[in-house]
From Swiss-Prot:
GO terms for biological process: photosynthetic electron transport in photosystem II. One of the components of the core complex of photosystem II (PSII). It binds chlorophyll and helps catalyze the primary light-induced photochemical processes of PSII. PSII is a light-driven water:plastoquinone oxidoreductase, using light energy to abstract electrons from H(2)O, generating O(2) and a proton gradient subsequently used for ATP formation. PSII is composed of 1 copy each of membrane proteins PsbA, PsbB, PsbC, PsbD, PsbE, PsbF, PsbH, PsbI, PsbJ, PsbK, PsbL, PsbM, PsbT, PsbX, PsbY, PsbZ, Psb30/Ycf12, at least 3 peripheral proteins of the oxygen-evolving complex and a large number of cofactors. It forms dimeric complexes. Binds multiple chlorophylls. PSII binds additional chlorophylls, carotenoids and specific lipids. This is Photosystem II CP47 reaction center protein. It comes from Chloranthus spicatus. The chain crosses the membrane at residues 21-36, 101-115, 140-156, 203-218, 237-252, 457-472.
Length: 508
């Protein structure tokens, strides 16, 4: 037929058997990619330090999704939460990857079978003997089956009734583990950060899907609606399917970027808004304040801050700091975090405690400014030394560390004080190994950023695809040039394949 590349899909237009075949092959490709990608990530993943080198710092993309659905262990003898295990069971990371690859192979064979045996009786209309699909009936079947799957996931997998549960954590991403979740049927179920809403919404949506599927199986659409929405045209199915996909892509781009119970920070990294709002910093100061009220010393109070919490409060873990065209995991940027140096507290010679202004998300450089508790500028690192009034040397700034590796260590020489003031702009200070991976020191985004960018971009493209195919199916007669003044009556729709010369014409 000599089709251009952008019209090749017309070969399956009136061919239900091969239409099914290419969709099975697509499923094979998706499943095969998922399994292969999982095996690749497992080959390069280092599980040795779940606190300072978690999966999201290493750029893992499919491992977090497996983990949030209840996979914890590897046949390599390690657990995602740290430590070793002896019996990971069949549903380990490798087991899930293998299952996807086996399923991919079966789909591949099924796709070939359906391509070869395309002319099946099931696809023939009994009345005409021609290939046809009862699209409203197929819609009902798919709606019913997806409703069953949705209900089953919410009622069994998430609740732990028959399944592992899902990943659940505290608001600060410290205590995450896989556990069963009870459905939240009250108003709290609509809070995107409440895991119970995942169970209840899947149960409710699944029930609705089952009922809607049964409705569409038992009730035929009215003729006027059938014709008005072009329910007999496969391109209508394409258009509405694209709409469902782009809508879902927009939704998950939002839940990923802004955060939700479905995107735990232990698996995907923190969100940019947690840096912007000082979310972890406030919790750290609250814990230190509680410790001081219990008569602990500054050193004791800061030493009790979990290293994991301090690590979240570091700008290098902000997904908005990495450029879209900086490839690679976060560890390839600022390096592999080795340890927390401790919290630096700066003081001037008059005894004021000074706080370094933190760098906003979208700055690459930022002036080093130290303010007191009232927000008054007391010291800085000046751009022009000749005009400086608040330089570290003039004000006599010193720094002392509390907690971490440098606990109790203080510095008064200006060069060292300025070094740590610059680093304090970026949040809590960590020792970073840039040699192992030859890290270049330029921040990278986390999988949270990549997922959001990819899904938002493709959602936009698919939105245009929905408009395109929706317009094509609604206005097919107009686009085909069939108008009231046409002097040859075309039996339109019998043969739609491009270049087919056999469409019957009858001169009026």
């Amino acid at each position: 037929m000599g089709l251009p590349w952008y019209r090749v899909h017309t070969v399956v237009l009136n061919d239900p058997g091969r239409l099914l075949s290419v969709h099975i092959m697509h499923t094979a490709l998706v499943s095969g990619w998922a399994g292969s990608m999982a095996l690749y990530e497992l080959a390069v993943f280092d599980p040795s330090d779940p606190v300072l080198d978690p999966m999201w710092r290493q750029g893992m993309f499919v491992i977090p999704f497996m983990t949030r659905l209840g996979i914890n262990n590897s046949w390599g003898g390690w657990s995602i939460t740290g430590g070793t295990i002896t019996n990971p069971g069949i549903w380990s990371y490798e087991g899930v990857a293998g299952a996807h690859i086996v399923f991919s192979g079966l789909c591949f064979l099924a796709a070939i079978w359906h391509w070869v045996y395309w002319d099946l009786e099931i696809f023939c209309d009994e009345r005409t003997g021609k290939p046809s699909l009862d699209l409203p009936k197929i819609f009902g079947i798919h709606l019913f089956l997806s409703g069953v799957a949705c209900f089953g996931f919410g009622a069994f997998h998430v609740t732990g009734l028959y399944g592992p549960g899902i990943w659940v954590s505290d608001p600060y991403g410290l205590t995450g583990k896989v556990q069963s979740v009870n459905p939240a049927w009250g108003a709290e179920g609509f809070d995107p950060f409440v895991p119970g809403g995942i169970a209840s919404h899947h149960i409710a949506a699944g029930t609705l899907g089952i009922l809607a599927g049964l409705f569409h199986l038992s009730v035929r659409p009215p003729q006027r609606l059938y014709k008005g929405l072009r329910m007999g045209n496969i391109e209508t199915v394409l258009s509405s399917s694209i709409a469902a996909v782009f809508f879902a892509a927009f939704v998950v781009a939002g839940t990923m970027w802004y955060g939700s119970a479905t995107t735990p920070i232990e698996l995907f990294g923190p969100t940019r808004y947690q840096w912007d709002q000082g979310y972890f910093q406030q919790e750290i100061y609250r814990r230190v304040g509680t410790g001081l009220s219990e008569n602990q010393s500054l050193s004791e109070a800061w030493s009790k801050i979990p290293e994991k919490l301090a690590f979240y409060d570091y700008i290098g873990n902000n997904p908005a700091k990495g450029g879209l065209f900086r490839a690679g995991p976060m560890d390839n940027g600022d390096g592999i975090a080795v340890g927390w140096l401790g919290h630096p507290i700066f003081r001037d010679k008059e005894g004021h405690e000074l706080f370094v202004r933190r760098m906003p998300t979208f700055f690459e450089t930022f002036p080093v400014v130290l303010v007191d508790g009232d927000g008054i500028v007391r010291a800085d690192v000046p751009f022009r030394r000749a005009e400086s009034k608040y330089s570290v040397e003039q004000v006599g700034v010193t720094v002392e560390f509390y907690g971490g590796e440098l606990n109790g260590v203080s510095y008064s020489d200006p060069a060292t004080v300025k070094k740590y003031a610059r680093r304090a702009q970026l949040g809590e200070i960590f020792e970073l190994d840039r040699a192992t991976l030859k890290s270049d020191g330029v921040f990278r985004s986390s999988p949270r950023g990549w997922f959001t960018f990819g899904h938002a971009t493709f959602a936009l493209l698919f939105f245009f695809g929905h408009i395109w195919h929706g317009a094509r199916t609604l206005f097919r007669d107009v686009f085909a040039g069939i108008d009231p003044d046409l002097d040859a009556q075309v039996e339109f729709g019998t043969f739609q394949k491009l270049g087919d010369p056999t469409t019957r014409r009858q001169v009026v």
